[in-house]
């Protein structure tokens, strides 16, 4: 197999026009920034981050709903990344309620078994985390347990991006983690070059090379540069469990309008575990902070350093937008490495 430097050299030979590809995975962005991979790429080849951070795309209205639950004297449980994401009324960290960080939904269920209080798990994530939540629901947790489903599905967001065309994309690098569960069959509907890529620098470079070759050939398909972990069908059992418990629904993404079929909600037979129904919670649209450009970063039409708040008013200790909170957020990643083109060598 060719080394990273050899693949980069081939890219320099083949890239004879402007290419812009989008990845939809915060782990890809972290790997690219950490290794300085962009410094190996031709000037005319750009790789931009899209809505690949599940915490970042959770809209303020859903954060406000979680805050409402904390005000209702519920024990609110969630992943650590979500604690500092600002809603319109503050964050879970500053709410003053009983908010607990857990490693997963099973830990939230354990808490529910040991208390008489209502326990709500704020359930965020793409198709990677939803099957585990679904499997937990199937175990029939105690009656004082429920989830606030903030799950999202990737393909409908890609469809929206392609239809809008504002990012002027030549292709997509598909999220490796998501595709281990879903496979890539659903992505074959899109008439654009795509590749599933892993997370090592060589994986990402190989994915870019495959995308460039598709564009030069004037064709489109889904190539798999990550066959050691991803198959076309994905994890059939995990998908079956997920759709046994959840059904798709229309939801808003932060930085996006309501995208049809892009969310997951509990089916009617499991609604006793649906915190929205249990506590009459309504997700409201909240206008964004006027100076924050997280919305543009998530749509691939701006980069973190374009924001006048970046690493000044907005930094991990005092985040203005969610992209500076999550370890998968582009702004936090760029803040950590503080460069557009790192001079760090490729491993």
Model-identified regions with their sequence ranges:
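Short amphipathic alpha-helical segments
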Residues: 34-35, 90, 133-135, 185, ...
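Short, surface-exposed amphipathic charged segments that create phosphate/polyanion-binding patches used
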Residues: 62-65, 113-119, 160-166, 187-188, ...
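Metallocofactor- and cofactor-centric catalytic cores in central/energy metabolism, strongly enriched
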Residues: 1-116, 130, 140-142, 148, ...
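Hydrophobic alpha-helical scaffolding
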Residues: 56, 122, 126, 194-201, ...
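Phosphate/pyrophosphate-binding betaalpha-module
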Residues: 122, 126-185
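A conserved active-site cap/scaffold subdomain adjacent to cofactor or substrate pockets
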Residues: 148, 165-230
């Amino acid at each position: 197999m060719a080394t990273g430097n050899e693949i980069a050299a081939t890219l320099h030979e083949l890239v004879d026009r402007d290419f812009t590809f989008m990845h939809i995975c915060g782990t890809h962005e972290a790997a690219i920034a950490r290794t300085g991979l962009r410094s190996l790429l031709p000037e005319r080849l750009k790789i931009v981050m899209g809505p690949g951070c599940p915490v970042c795309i959770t809209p303020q209205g859903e954060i406000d709903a979680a805050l409402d639950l904390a005000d209702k004297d519920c024990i609110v449980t969630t992943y650590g990344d979500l604690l500092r994401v600002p809603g319109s009324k503050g964050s879970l960290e500053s709410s003053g309620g009983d908010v607990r960080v857990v490693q997963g939904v099973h830990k939230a269920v354990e808490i529910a078994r040991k208390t008489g209080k209502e326990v709500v798990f704020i359930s965020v994530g793409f198709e990677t985390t939803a099957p585990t939540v679904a499997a937990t629901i199937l175990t029939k947790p105690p009656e004082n347990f429920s989830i606030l489903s903030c799950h999202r599905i990737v393909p409908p967001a890609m469809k929206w991006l392609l239809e809008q065309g504002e990012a002027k994309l030549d292709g997509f690098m598909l999220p490796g983690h998501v595709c281990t569960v879903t496979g890539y069959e659903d992505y074959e509907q899109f008439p654009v070059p795509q590749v599933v890529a892993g997370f090592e620098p060589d994986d990402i470079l190989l994915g870019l090379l495959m995308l460039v070759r598709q564009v030069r050939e004037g064709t489109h398909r889904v190539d798999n540069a990550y066959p050691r972990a991803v198959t076309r069908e994905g994890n059939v059992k995990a998908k079956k469990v997920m759709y046994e418990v959840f059904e798709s629904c229309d939801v808003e993404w932060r930085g996006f309008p309501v995208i049809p079929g892009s969310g997951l909600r509990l089916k009617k037979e499991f609604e006793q575990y649906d915190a929205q129904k249990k506590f009459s919670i309504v997700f409201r649209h909240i206008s964004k902070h006027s100076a924050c450009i997280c919305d543009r970063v998530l749509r691939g039409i701006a980069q973190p350093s374009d924001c006048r708040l970046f690493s000044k008013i907005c930094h991990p200790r005092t985040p203005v937008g969610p992209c500076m909170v999550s370890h998968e957020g582009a702004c936090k990643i760029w803040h950590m490495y503080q460069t557009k083109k790192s001079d760090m060598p490729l491993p």
